[in-house]
Amino acid sequence: MNEFAIILMKKDKENVIIEEVSTLDLGLDAEYINSIFIKDKDDKEYISIQLSTKSGVEDWEYSAIYDYYEEDKILEYLKSKGKTDAVVSICEEEFNPTWEYTFIFSEEIEALELFVNELVQVHKNELQDVFLEIKDKEGEYL
């Protein structure tokens, strides 16, 4: 089993990378992460993590996934973990369905690594439910 490591970077207000913060050791599910970084806003550090499908989807699936994916489930998970400030946005400019979750960064790196693994698992489970739900709906989207 191959493990993935993701370098957590910090960006400035102009979106320029200014610092390498840490390396997060993640399992195979890291394939669901498009990007993750820290950014300062209002004198606080925020984590932004973009989660997507781990592989390409067909055109009809793109729309169906957005229709059936429940961002609120992920937000509920984040809030249950103390991320009451968490927000989600859809990244329409991405090739595959992608959601960006943003919340205040307040953990030690080891705790963040565990948290990101759990978050990706919740996202992966939601996508699996979505794919089961849409598997016979191609005709509705063509």
Give residue ranges: language-model regions.
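Glycine-rich loops and low-complexity Gly/Arg-rich segments
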Residues: Y32-I33, I74-L78, E126-V130
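Amphipathic, interaction-prone secondary-structure segments
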Residues: S22-E71
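Short, extreme N-terminal segment that most often corresponds to the first beta-strand
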Residues: M1-V21
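Ampiphathic alpha-helical segments that act as solvent-exposed interaction surfaces
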Residues: K81-A86, I90-L142
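Ordered hydrophobic segments in well-structured contexts
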Residues: A5-L8, S48-S52, S89, T98-I104
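A generic structural signal for short, non-catalytic loop/turn and secondary-structure boundary residues
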Residues: M1, K44, E94-N96
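Short, internal acidic amphipathic alpha-helical interface segments
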Residues: E58-T98
